[in-house]
Amino acid sequence: MPELPEVETVRRGLQPAMEGATIVRAETRRKDLRFPFQTDFVARLEGQAVTGLGRRAKYLLADLASGDVLLMHLGMSGSFRVIDAAGVTVPGDFHRPRGEDRVHDHVRFTMSSRAEIVFNDPRRFGYMKIVARSALGDEPLLKGLGPEPLGNEFDAAVLAHGCRNRKTSLKAALLDQRVVAGLGNIYVCEALFRARLSPRRLAATLAMKTGAPSERAERLVGAIRDVLNQAIEAGGSSLRDHRQTTGELGYFQHSFQVYDREGDKCRTPACKGAVKRFTQNGRSTFWCPVCQT
């Protein structure tokens, strides 16, 4: 599933085509994706200007002039492509090659610029929903999400507070969207490696007995920010479904230190360990047991 860097890459790719333009036509080619489309989905989109395109965790949020917000989630295999008036895919981020799977083009927006934005989703785990801006705080899909890891509200004290009473592993806590929003398996493995922290470590050890953040929490926040920013700069990670809206792959997978590198030598200077893999809460965890403690 796309994680925060991939979704942010999508947002940046769609932004030039959507922001400031009006949705002239909205077309759904089936009655549902993961969930059924609202009965007034098309009517609430057509004729509306997109005043802003944001992101919350792994969700895209398009603000409409009507006061509604179009909430979009990529699911497992969802992707967007932007096509200009001449039928040429224009720069942006996150789509599959044109012509390969148009049968899976499920949603199409025609913009006032005559550009078209197409949502393709072979596995149909993605979804779209229109929510009134005034009700966004109570939206079940967003309610309860933790702080954005790249936002000003996220720091060592916030992370330590979110983990202080948890009896789960550190990795499990970081994957809990209530603790911090937008992280997934790839970037949690990478951040823990960079912070030299074991994924098996008890999450509560990020806080000292006084409740203040430990030095581990400081290291981990820095590592999370670094790995996410580097991944966004690289256009995300392309393992299975992720491509940029030009059809290009993201390149951060070439910078993985541990993820999907089982058996490789640890990349920490002077460390003689090797990357190991084990199953943790149903997911593969990659780490170096020598330098991650």
UniProtKB/Swiss-Prot annotation:
Entry superkingdom: Bacteria
Assembly notes: Monomer.
Cofactor list: Zn(2+)
Keyword hit for Ribosomal protein: no
GO biological processes: base-excision repair
InterPro entries: DNA_glyclase/AP_lyase_DNA-bd, DNA_glyclase_Znf_dom_DNA_BS, Formamido-pyr_DNA_Glyclase, FPG_cat, MutM-like_N-ter, Ribosomal_uS13-like_H2TH, Znf_DNA_glyclase/AP_lyase
Gene3D superfamilies listed in its UniProt record: 1.10.8.50, MutM-like, N-terminal
Keyword Transmembrane annotated: no
GO MF annotations in UniProt: 8-oxo-7,8-dihydroguanine DNA N-glycosylase activity; class I DNA-(apurinic or apyrimidinic site) endonuclease activity; damaged DNA binding; zinc ion binding
E.C. number: 3.2.2.23, 4.2.99.18
Its biological purpose: Involved in base excision repair of DNA damaged by oxidation or by mutagenic agents. Acts as a DNA glycosylase that recognizes and removes damaged bases. Has a preference for oxidized purines, such as 7,8-dihydro-8-oxoguanine (8-oxoG). Has AP (apurinic/apyrimidinic) lyase activity and introduces nicks in the DNA strand. Cleaves the DNA backbone by beta-delta elimination to generate a single-strand break at the site of the removed base with both 3'- and 5'-phosphates.
Organism listed in the record: Nitrobacter winogradskyi (strain ATCC 25391 / DSM 10237 / CIP 104748 / NCIMB 11846 / Nb-255)
UniProt binding sites for DNA: H104, R123, R166
Cofactor note: Binds 1 zinc ion per subunit.
Entry-linked PANTHER family: FORMAMIDOPYRIMIDINE-DNA GLYCOSYLASE
Active-site feature positions: P2, E3, K58, R283
UniProt-recorded name of the protein: Formamidopyrimidine-DNA glycosylase
Key words, A-Z: DNA damage, DNA repair, DNA-binding, Glycosidase, Hydrolase, Lyase, Metal-binding, Multifunctional enzyme, Zinc, Zinc-finger
Reaction(s) catalysed (UniProt annotation): Hydrolysis of DNA containing ring-opened 7-methylguanine residues, releasing 2,6-diamino-4-hydroxy-5-(N-methyl)formamidopyrimidine; 2'-deoxyribonucleotide-(2'-deoxyribose 5'-phosphate)-2'-deoxyribonucleotide-DNA = a 3'-end 2'-deoxyribonucleotide-(2,3-dehydro-2,3-deoxyribose 5'-phosphate)-DNA + a 5'-end 5'-phospho-2'-deoxyribonucleoside-DNA + H(+)
Organism classification: Bacteria, Pseudomonadati, Pseudomonadota, Alphaproteobacteria, Hyphomicrobiales
Zinc finger (FPG-type) stretch: 257-293
Family classification: Belongs to the FPG family.
